């Protein structure tokens, strides 16, 4: 609720980091707000194909009393316990393809997102942070790349797009395989 918005120029001047818990960069083109909790200890991703393992919590940002019936703050789906980040259930697995500034992803294997939303494509809001993170293969919850996102319907799941609602995410990104 009480976030400090910074613009992209400030974000780049801070070496693509947000400096406070409540500091979020607004990416105007997508409408996504991002707070970098941990950039990761790996290297920036270059052109190629990667297997990414993610843990996430998805929460509603608005109350809806229509077809979807949700309260702001409701957990919509998750595969991570937000108060216990070392809790390890099955990660969300997706194949990421990077080509220049283009990022695309497809969920594979065990997928909570597919089970919940019946979509195989990774939401664009999930892909945007990967341009600025350094994911690695790590078992340390302190070293894994981690962000908080405020995602508008247009960069979210197919259901968020259909019913026009924004979501909050906390997501980790780890290199798989």
Could you tell me what each predicted segment is?
Residues 1-177:
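Cross-family detector of peptidyl-prolyl cis-trans isomerase
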